[in-house]
């Protein structure tokens, strides 16, 4: 059997098991309502938390940047690809995050790849929450460090693993956790993690992709939310969710950022963000710096939708953020529920095994500051209608 036939067989297996990903194409900009294949639907599955992906200020900033700086950076950051606008973004992000310095890279995924293998190796131990993001898992693999996986949000389990790492005489101990876990919307027990890190002389790294622009003062993230900015050694952020653009960043002490500029492969061997992306991200940072109006609107919407859907009889688990997992449990019924939502004009994705454990299938609803009360009421009415028709209510 040749290579391509093998690929066809693998794709067929995915299709037969119901795991083949279907990619829908948007025919409009991101917004509360979007067009997909000629159909107008309420968007309840994007990460556009604050509605900045099609914001006029960001678009104007991007257009002006193209006029002034061109469309591409032309090189990697260390040769001729660092423009003044890149440094302006990094400075503003550092001010916003209340840290000494930041480093912007091509994506949040790349940010984890830039940090983890650069600061750890075979002599070190990495303590990772079992539900951490794929980019963390891959970064840990690349580092070749010893792995100590602790049970999700279980501080007793973390301490047990720290004791093991200490017995193994690890040179460095790096605790890594997501800030907000994207499937359930729960947040990391950061105060307890920091306390254990001090006790066992470990570093703390938080990937706050879903916390940036959502938690903390003006959306500064989970470290600010818990007033622990000084205690967290490394924060990873993304510019593609609440910030509405694309890219990732690393926030921390200047010496860390200086070291990453010398050694981090994703920084050294990839071109920098385009001027348009950089300018738009800078404008998004300014908007968050200036006002918390969008963050407040996001939370008002989330609290309204979550309270109403719980009153309806749905289980939304232990979410602590606008991420709302509407539990259906049964895989087949969850997929059918998602299809019926789409027929009724709502785009909300089904999350099933293996993304989540068997029997934990859900519709993951992503609330945005762009949603109006009428939008949310429309969605609630459809959840009630479909729930009754499928017997999930």
Swiss-Prot record:
**Residues annotated for substrate binding in this entry:** 133, 355
Q: Which UniProt keywords apply?
A: Acyltransferase, Biotin biosynthesis, Pyridoxal phosphate, Transferase
What EC numbers are recorded for this enzyme?
2.3.1.47
On whether Magnesium is a keyword of this UniProt record, the answer is no
Q: Which GO annotations describe the biological process of this protein? A: biotin biosynthetic process
SUPFAM superfamilies in alphabetical order: PLP-dependent transferases
Enumerate the cofactors the protein uses. pyridoxal 5'-phosphate
Record's catalysed reaction(s) = 6-carboxyhexanoyl-[ACP] + L-alanine + H(+) = (8S)-8-amino-7-oxononanoate + holo-[ACP] + CO2
At the top of the EC hierarchy, this enzyme's class is transferase
Residues annotated as binding pyridoxal 5'-phosphate: 108-109, 182, 207-210, 238-241
| One of the record's GO molecular function terms | 8-amino-7-oxononanoate synthase activity
The portions of this protein that span the membrane are: none
The metabolic or biological pathway listed in the UniProt record of this protein is: Cofactor biosynthesis; biotin biosynthesis
Question: N6-(pyridoxal phosphate)lysine-modified residues are where?
Answer: 241
Function of the protein: Catalyzes the decarboxylative condensation of pimeloyl-[acyl-carrier protein] and L-alanine to produce 8-amino-7-oxononanoate (AON), [acyl-carrier protein], and carbon dioxide.
Q: Which family does it belong to?
A: Belongs to the class-II pyridoxal-phosphate-dependent aminotransferase family. BioF subfamily.
Subunit architecture: Homodimer.
Q: What is the protein name for this chain?
A: 8-amino-7-oxononanoate synthase
Which organism is the protein's source? Answer: Petrotoga mobilis (strain DSM 10674 / SJ95)
């Amino acid at each position: 059997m040749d290579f391509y036939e093998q690929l066809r067989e693998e794709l067929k297996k995915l299709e037969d098991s119901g795991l083949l990903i279907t990619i829908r194409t948007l025919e409009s900009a991101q917004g509360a309502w979007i067009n997909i294949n000629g159909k107008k639907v309420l968007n309840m599955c994007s990460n556009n938390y604050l509605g900045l992906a099609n914001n006029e200020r960001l678009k104007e900033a991007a257009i002006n940047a193209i006029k002034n700086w061109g469309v591409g950076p032309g090189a990697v950051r260390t040769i001729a690809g660092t423009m003044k606008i890149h440094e302006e973004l990094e400075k503003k992000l550092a001010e916003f995050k209340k840290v000494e310095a930041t480093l912007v890279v091509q994506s949040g995924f790349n940010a984890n790849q830039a940090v983890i293998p650069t600061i750890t190796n075979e002599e070190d131990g990495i303590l990772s929450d079992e539900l951490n993001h794929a980019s963390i898992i891959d970064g840990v693999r690349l580092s070749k460090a010893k792995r100590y996986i602790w049970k999700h949000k279980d501080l007793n389990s973390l301490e047990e693993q720290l004791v093991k790492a200490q017995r193994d005489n690890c040179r460095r101990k790096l605790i890594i956790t997501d800030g907000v876990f994207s499937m359930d919307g729960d947040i990391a027990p950061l105060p307890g993690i920091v306390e254990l890190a001090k006790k066992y002389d470990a570093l703390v790294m938080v990937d706050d992709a879903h916390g940036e622009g959502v938690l903390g003062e003006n959306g500064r993230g989970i470290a600010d939310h818990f007033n622990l900015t000084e205690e967290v050694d490394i924060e990873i952020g993304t510019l593609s969710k609440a910030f509405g653009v694309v890219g990732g960043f690393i926030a921390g002490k200047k010496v860390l950022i200086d070291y990453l500029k010398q050694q981090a492969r994703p920084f050294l061997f990839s071109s920098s963000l385009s001027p348009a992306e950089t300018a738009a991200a800078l404008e998004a940072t300014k908007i968050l710096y200036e006002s918390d109006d969008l963050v407040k609107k996001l939370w008002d919407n989330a609290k309204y939708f979550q309270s109403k859907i719980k009153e309806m009889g749905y289980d939304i688990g232990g979410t602590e953020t606008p991420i709302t997992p509407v539990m259906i449990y049964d895989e087949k019924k969850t997929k059918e529920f998602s299809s019926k939502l789409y027929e009724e004009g709502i785009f909300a994705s089904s999350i099933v095994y293996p993304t989540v454990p068997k029997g934990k299938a859900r519709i993951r609803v992503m609330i945005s500051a762009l949603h109006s009360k009428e939008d949310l009421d429309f969605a609630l009415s459809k959840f009630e209608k479909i729930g009754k028709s499928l017997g999930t209510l």
